[in-house]
A protein has these predicted regions:
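Flavin-dependent oxidoreductase catalytic core characteristic
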Residues: 1-147
Length: 147
């Protein structure tokens, strides 16, 4: 709706991409292939976990990311059902790395909104951000400056 009226304007490829987005994780097993790649890397190179957690650091001063990293570390204590949990594990790794990169990028409005909505149990659907975020700064950042 936000990219084409009531969802019927199709002057570009964008509506098709949005329409197909829900099935992207199942087409040709791409989501599962990514999970298998993560599991394969973990089994072939056990040191990859040390590299991952070294990269994530201590949360870069954000308590929510630090808690996510601790929860992620706990997921590796019992690996008896790791194949069953592979999708959740892969998602948690990706979310942690995304949050870390956003914090490093230095735009606190964007990183705060991402972490609040992805790591802190905030709304995950479009337009459902938790209260108290600097959404004006996010909008201003993405609004073109016209001379």
């Amino acid at each position: 709706e936000c990219m084409g009226g009531a969802g019927y304007v199709e002057d570009s490829i964008l509506p098709r991409l949005y329409r197909e987005a829900p099935v992207n994780s199942t087409w040709e097993g791409s989501g599962n292939v990514q999970c298998l790649d993560v599991l394969r890397a973990l089994s072939k190179e056990p040191g990859v976990l040390d590299v991952l957690f070294s990269e994530l650091g201590d949360g870069h001063g954000d308590k929510r990311l630090a808690a996510h990293i601790q929860q992620l570390q706990a997921q590796f204590k019992d690996t008896s059902d790791i194949q069953y949990r592979a999708r959740q594990l892969t998602e948690d790794i990706a979310l942690g790395l995304q949050a870390k990169l956003l914090l490093e990028a230095g735009n606190s409005a964007v990183s705060d909104a991402f972490i609040a909505s992805r790591l802190s149990g905030g709304g995950r659907v479009y337009g459902a951000l938790p209260r108290g975020l600097d959404v004006e700064a996010i909008v201003a950042r993405s609004t073109p400056q016209i001379l």
